[in-house]
Amino acid sequence: MGAVLRSLLACSFCVLLRAAPLLLYANRRDLRLVDATNGKENATIVVGGLEDAAAVDFVFGHGLIYWSDVSEEAIKRTEFNKSESVQNVVVSGLLSPDGLACDWLGEKLYWTDSETNRIEVSNLDGSLRKVLFWQELDQPRAIALDPSSGFMYWTDWGEVPKIERAGMDGSSRFVIINTEIYWPNGLTLDYQERKLYWADAKLNFIHKSNLDGTNRQAVVKGSLPHPFALTLFEDTLYWTDWNTHSILACNKYTGEGLREIHSNIFSPMDIHAFSQQRQPNATNPCGIDNGGCSHLCLMSPVKPFYQCACPTGVKLMENGKTCKDGATELLLLARRTDLRRISLDTPDFTDIVLQLEDIRHAIAIDYDPVEGYIYWTDDEVRAIRRSFIDGSGSQFVVTAQIAHPDGIAVDWVARNLYWTDTGTDRIEVTRLNGTMRKILISEDLEEPRAIVLDPMVGYMYWTDWGEIPKIERAALDGSDRVVLVNTSLGWPNGLALDYDEGTIYWGDAKTDKIEVMNTDGTGRRVLVEDKIPHIFGFTLLGDYVYWTDWQRRSIERVHKRSAEREVIIDQLPDLMGLKATSVHRVIGSNPCAEDNGGCSHLCLYRPQGLRCACPIGFELIGDMKTCIVPEAFLLFSRRADIRRISLETNNNNVAIPLTGVKEASALDFDVTDNRIYWTDISLKTISRAFMNGSALEHVVEFGLDYPEGMAVDWLGKNLYWADTGTNRIEVSKLDGQHRQVLVWKDLDSPRALALDPAEGFMYWTEWGGKPKIDRAAMDGSERTTLVPNVGRANGLTIDYAKRRLYWTDLDTNLIESSDMLGLNREVIADDLPHPFGLTQYQDYIYWTDWSRRSIERANKTSGQNRTIIQGHLDYVMDILVFHSSRQAGWNECASSNGHCSHLCLAVPVGGFVCGCPAHYSLNADNRTCSAPSTFLLFSQKSAINRMVIDEQQSPDIILPIHSLRNVRAIDYDPLDKQLYWIDSRQNSIRKAHEDGGQGFNVVANSVANQNLEIQPYDLSIDIYSRYIYWTCEATNVIDVTRLDGRSVGVVLKGEQDRPRAIVVNPEKGYMYFTNLQERSPKIERAALDGTEREVLFFSGLSKPIALALDSKLGKLFWADSDLRRIESSDLSGANRIVLEDSNILQPVGLTVFENWLYWIDKQQQMIEKIDMTGREGRTKVQARIAQLSDIHAVKELNLQEYRQHPCAQDNGGCSHICLVKGDGTTRCSCPMHLVLLQDELSCGEPPTCSPQQFTCFTGDIDCIPVAWRCDGFTECEDHSDELNCPVCSESQFQCASGQCIDGALRCNGDANCQDKSDEKNCEVLCLIDQFRCANGQCVGKHKKCDHSVDCSDRSDELDCYPTEEPAPQATNTVGSVIGVIVTIFVSGTIYFICQRMLCPRMKGDGETMTNDYVVHSPASVPLGYVPHPSSLSGSLPGMSRGKSMISSLSIMGGSSGPPYDRAHVTGASSSSSSSTKGTYFPAILNPPPSPATERSHYTMEFGYSSNSPSTHRSYSYRPYSYRHFAPPTTPCSTDVCDSDYAPSRRMTSVATAKGYTSDVNYDSEPVPPPPTPRSQYLSAEENYESCPPSPYTERSYSHHLYPPPPSPCTDSS
């Protein structure tokens, strides 16, 4: 920057020597200086690399340059001699700072903002910022200062354009120009002449006037294209012009001497004469001691010529000099992605953004006046946070077990924090620092939202917008709950208390009312019911109720007695909660205020007095003040929750805060980890969480049916469970990994499960046909029956000290006991109504009774001393005592997992065995495991299973793969051990590892669920090339995609094709597929690139739905679902036989595994197999498997054989498709949209042939006439013109050669087929009303002797006798017509001969080819007709001898074959190809024009798109808005979004910057509120929907595209 400094100093010196100044201007991307006398030279860049610099000014005396950047929404500065050092001056609260001016005397910075419509001032460093003007401003732009007189001037180009003047202290505001003005842009002052100059870009003039607006005169008029900024130096005016991209100048008096100073400016913006003369020195009234002001000292036009002022929101004290210490009353506002504060002390109501990070979806907000913390909830971060009022000291308060915290309230007296959670449906409390958390209310809550507290009385109030909306009240400890209002409510969103008058106010977003009542529910009345379309946030302070409105995008307030309303903030989107508060005033007290009421943890005040409470995991001891961690306690599970009860006190049970529990059944714990485990038979999961409810996770999610029994192996850290539905006992690690089936044979409804890890035994009960209690080693071995004669035993538990078993018998209603061998049975209790769960601790047994709805206790040996521990409990499923004595002992698995790689399973006599996950095998070291290499995979609708044929292993397990919705087909890559499947719901191909990890979308629709682009049907993997071949039901093609998701392209496509099932044989280079063409299904074979296509079978098929092949046996298998049979053949199609056709109902999948062919029958829900050798016949493999969809065999991969495949290494060197030829070498090929290049390895773009041409895939010939395509003769060197030829349509006749002709030409006496097959076997009988021509042709009898030849042999006009003399005129007419026809025919024939045979053909290099052709064409050439080769002479290399040439400008008026489909290029010039290969005919001389880019409908850019700083926008500087149009409406301008409409509806919504249109069908069902309203200023690129579709669940907004809906929805827990 040294050169810049030297230039600046030199130029500044020049200014002193001559009258021409340096001009400082903004160029959007940089700031520059240019010499006004030599503007043709390059300008000097002062600051570069800017985003969108608009306004610029300077303080010459301090060497500072300031500019505004509208893209970064900031004002910045730099020093002359340090221009590489850029400082931020103002970075918040700006949207479009269009104007900027420096007060060089008072050292202040003034600016205009055309988005916020404010004029502000601050110190030169950006501190002590103050809003001067905020009313009656509409698009303020240029601003100029006159510090010596204390005046400021600005332009306003809004609805009422004008130029105003005011004191620099905000006083004496006056409009000085308001006529003949439209777009006043530039503004400058002549300090010597006391004149005001301005430029109008619409009216194209520069005018001047006195500083008070009088004596207005034109300086330049009519010759200004688009003046923008204006400055003055001595006698010359300078301005920037947007149209000419230049700086111009003229005489300031006369306007003469108009000239261009500097041109070729990228985007000229603001401009100033950079000179000390433009900032003359004068007396500074603020120069001494800042004028005595504590904060701001601003110039004023009235004595004493200055005025003290305070920063925004702060009042000036009565002495007129000193500002108060901040605002005394604030309005705190939560927006979606930021928090703001608004001072209620001053009338400007300026919102100031707090400098906080990572706010994603703030909802509720509250304030603690004692410590000065703001508290807020974030629905997306799922946390409660706090910070000081200036944004500093940000902390996370609560982060665990938070779902959707919609309401928050501070108890400033007891120092507690309350919140509602509409995800967990709970109201909870904690200390203000987030410790000592406790659930207060968790029952009968649907959608709790707003919550307020009255610490002085001891009540809390909350709203619930569930199915039955209501407002409730309870004591601060959750007791004494009562409903205050439950009628005439819709969406009660907001709630506020008036402590002085004892009333409670609320706002309803559905009824659109603000109502009030007494705190006891009496005296209900309406305060406001007009123009409040959607209330959300709600608060009260003093005499005013404040609220936010989503739809109006506003904050308003109403006087609580007079009902007078006032808008505080308008057009601010994403409004959520708000809180009006006194900053320091603290009201009220209660006994909890002093020493926390004597409580060790929580002090909760009630109307009856304080109550000490304990957080989760603690219990209150006898003094009722102190909380301790109990040594032991009872845990029990009910349907929807898990609770605990103290064994030492009489306190009520306490719910453990767990979310999402549906139907908890079995329960256990791990005392060392302080976790609980439970099964959920509704969710079909096994879950765990810490005792405080945190870190909840599902450890087993797949393959469960009714997991009624479960137990924790606390030594081996394993989890055991019994599944009554699947009849299995399984084990895994505590985190669900390494799952293995231990017992599956001869199990009949296993139920309760108990473990004795120290001894190595497990015990379980069975409820089947012969109920019993069994025992086995913990690895599943040594199974034996202990108690055979028993009813349905449940609650099996072990007394580890006395070595006895206990259980309840549901059939006899007894509690019994035996020793560990099942002997010495004793009845402990016999007069029980309905005992169910059971546990033991010390000298007692504890059980649940469903009839008594109780938990009871009795002596474990005698059954005496029975006591009811807890009553009024419905359907307690399981019970246990949480204590370390229940998990004692030791075995070798407790130490380093027994050094096992996976599972360590205890066995009797202190031993252990290492276990492996299901289907894994234990290695010779007896420690480690190996994954299976050979197995079967089969899929169901929402699961994929693995099966092994091993008597020692459980046959099948469900793989833990998430998000399976509708699995249609599966395949497996044995190299990477990745599973691939088609999801027909998402219309995608996905892959994942067997353990569910590394999930990935391989092929997916770009637009989900609408206008489906793809619809995969079947897939097959080429493991050598690493490709997936898949058929698409939507586009009817065979597509190829790399395993990493990169597309290769379509390899097979035909007009009539319907490829469905597919299997590849990469060892031979072929693929086989079913082609379900209408009325003619086929099984076909083609090379892997789609060439060499042949039909193997077209008869004896109805719906061939599945394919399989065995490459080693050389066999192809298929299943026909309509014919209900399975067939096979050789891979060539020979030796077709029916393998099985009996008792097959709906075969949908086939696979070959060893010597067996496996298939799945969807209707019979069965997997079967048949021995292909015929020795063992047909066998059922597994039955009762619902919703089967596919099956696939995985064989062990021989790496040596794999590496020998020529395509396995780098895809054989091919860029796309690698095929194996018969000799074992490779051939590279390409998908249909590409062609093979000359290196015969790489694919590239095809040559550009005309629409009337066909592009050969490879070879030296690029283009041939499309009429030669599929004509039975090969012209392309690679024969590609005769590949994939379409089947003739019903209206056509297929010649023996495959050529298609019009069916009407069959047997017409002329050979239209090149092989003349259309005239063979033509013995046809004509109808009664037809005449038979001599050649066999049939024509209507009325055409006989009608003077018109109808038979091709003219036989219809032979032997005719005229009946009357023809009129001469008619004869002349007929003759004329015939003459015309003959003339046309002769001309056409000559033209055809010229074009086809005689005209020279151009090579690719432009040389003339001299081959001549003679065509003997028929009298008429039907569309698509190609002459027989015998009628042609001449030949070309690579074409059939005697082939005719058809010009690209065909005389037949159109293409004679299918359109060019390999390159999909239309409208391109054939001469544009870079290929040097030959073309069969000359290129079109004048190629068609290229497609034009559609122009924007708007030629004028829109401005800064949002009123919200948080909204991301990409725009350039906005010149003008369309101010004569109304601003965009809100997404729903009436209550249409709030009112009733169907939850399921079709909606079309189009939004532009000028408004919205929507098409919505409504009915009477309530729905959530509309999305958060957008700003008035919308980007032209943005599209917004109006009312969103109604969610079907409470969490429909979980993606946070919109604020949380207050619609009545289903419970989300």
From Swiss-Prot:
<dbReference type="GO" id="GO:0001702">
    <property type="term" value="P:gastrulation with mouth forming second"/>
</dbReference>
<feature type="disulfide bond">
    <location>
        <begin position="310"/>
        <end position="323"/>
    </location>
</feature>
<dbReference type="GO" id="GO:0003344">
    <property type="term" value="P:pericardium morphogenesis"/>
</dbReference>
<feature type="compositionally biased region" description="Pro residues">
    <location>
        <begin position="1602"/>
        <end position="1613"/>
    </location>
</feature>
<dbReference type="GO" id="GO:0005769">
    <property type="term" value="C:early endosome"/>
</dbReference>
<feature type="lipid moiety-binding region" description="S-palmitoyl cysteine">
    <location>
        <position position="1399"/>
    </location>
</feature>
<keyword id="KW-0472">Membrane</keyword>
<feature type="cross-link" description="Glycyl lysine isopeptide (Lys-Gly) (interchain with G-Cter in ubiquitin)">
    <location>
        <position position="1403"/>
    </location>
</feature>
<dbReference type="GO" id="GO:0030326">
    <property type="term" value="P:embryonic limb morphogenesis"/>
</dbReference>
<feature type="domain" description="LDL-receptor class A 2">
    <location>
        <begin position="1287"/>
        <end position="1323"/>
    </location>
</feature>
<dbReference type="Pfam" id="PF00058">
    <property type="entry name" value="Ldl_recept_b"/>
</dbReference>
<dbReference type="GO" id="GO:0060284">
    <property type="term" value="P:regulation of cell development"/>
</dbReference>
<dbReference type="GO" id="GO:0060070">
    <property type="term" value="P:canonical Wnt signaling pathway"/>
</dbReference>
<feature type="glycosylation site" description="N-linked (GlcNAc...) asparagine">
    <location>
        <position position="865"/>
    </location>
</feature>
<feature type="region of interest" description="Beta-propeller 3">
    <location>
        <begin position="631"/>
        <end position="890"/>
    </location>
</feature>
<dbReference type="GO" id="GO:0110135">
    <property type="term" value="P:Norrin signaling pathway"/>
</dbReference>
<feature type="disulfide bond">
    <location>
        <begin position="1214"/>
        <end position="1228"/>
    </location>
</feature>
<dbReference type="GO" id="GO:2000648">
    <property type="term" value="P:positive regulation of stem cell proliferation"/>
</dbReference>
<dbReference type="GO" id="GO:0050678">
    <property type="term" value="P:regulation of epithelial cell proliferation"/>
</dbReference>
<dbReference type="GO" id="GO:0060444">
    <property type="term" value="P:branching involved in mammary gland duct morphogenesis"/>
</dbReference>
<dbReference type="GO" id="GO:0045944">
    <property type="term" value="P:positive regulation of transcription by RNA polymerase II"/>
</dbReference>
<keyword id="KW-0217">Developmental protein</keyword>
<feature type="repeat" description="LDL-receptor class B 3">
    <location>
        <begin position="150"/>
        <end position="193"/>
    </location>
</feature>
<feature type="short sequence motif" description="PPPSP motif C">
    <location>
        <begin position="1568"/>
        <end position="1575"/>
    </location>
</feature>
<feature type="repeat" description="LDL-receptor class B 7">
    <location>
        <begin position="415"/>
        <end position="457"/>
    </location>
</feature>
<dbReference type="InterPro" id="IPR036055">
    <property type="entry name" value="LDL_receptor-like_sf"/>
</dbReference>
<dbReference type="GO" id="GO:0090245">
    <property type="term" value="P:axis elongation involved in somitogenesis"/>
</dbReference>
<dbReference type="GO" id="GO:0021587">
    <property type="term" value="P:cerebellum morphogenesis"/>
</dbReference>
<feature type="short sequence motif" description="PPPSP motif A">
    <location>
        <begin position="1487"/>
        <end position="1493"/>
    </location>
</feature>
<feature type="modified residue" description="Phosphothreonine">
    <location>
        <position position="1479"/>
    </location>
</feature>
<dbReference type="GO" id="GO:0021861">
    <property type="term" value="P:forebrain radial glial cell differentiation"/>
</dbReference>
<dbReference type="GO" id="GO:0060042">
    <property type="term" value="P:retina morphogenesis in camera-type eye"/>
</dbReference>
<comment type="subunit">
    <text>Homodimer; disulfide-linked. Forms phosphorylated oligomer aggregates on Wnt-signaling. Component of the Wnt-Fzd-LRP5-LRP6 complex. Interacts (via the extracellular domain) with WNT1; the interaction is enhanced by prior formation of the Wnt/Fzd complex. Interacts (via the beta-propeller regions 3 and 4) with WNT3A. Interacts (via the beta-propeller regions 1 and 2) with WNT9B. Interacts with FZD5; the interaction forms a coreceptor complex for Wnt signaling and is inhibited by DKK1 and DRAXIN.</text>
</comment>
<keyword id="KW-1003">Cell membrane</keyword>
<dbReference type="GO" id="GO:0009952">
    <property type="term" value="P:anterior/posterior pattern specification"/>
</dbReference>
<feature type="repeat" description="LDL-receptor class B 8">
    <location>
        <begin position="458"/>
        <end position="501"/>
    </location>
</feature>
<dbReference type="GO" id="GO:0045778">
    <property type="term" value="P:positive regulation of ossification"/>
</dbReference>
<feature type="disulfide bond">
    <location>
        <begin position="286"/>
        <end position="297"/>
    </location>
</feature>
<keyword id="KW-0597">Phosphoprotein</keyword>
<dbReference type="GO" id="GO:0030901">
    <property type="term" value="P:midbrain development"/>
</dbReference>
<dbReference type="GO" id="GO:0002053">
    <property type="term" value="P:positive regulation of mesenchymal cell proliferation"/>
</dbReference>
<feature type="domain" description="EGF-like 1">
    <location>
        <begin position="282"/>
        <end position="324"/>
    </location>
</feature>
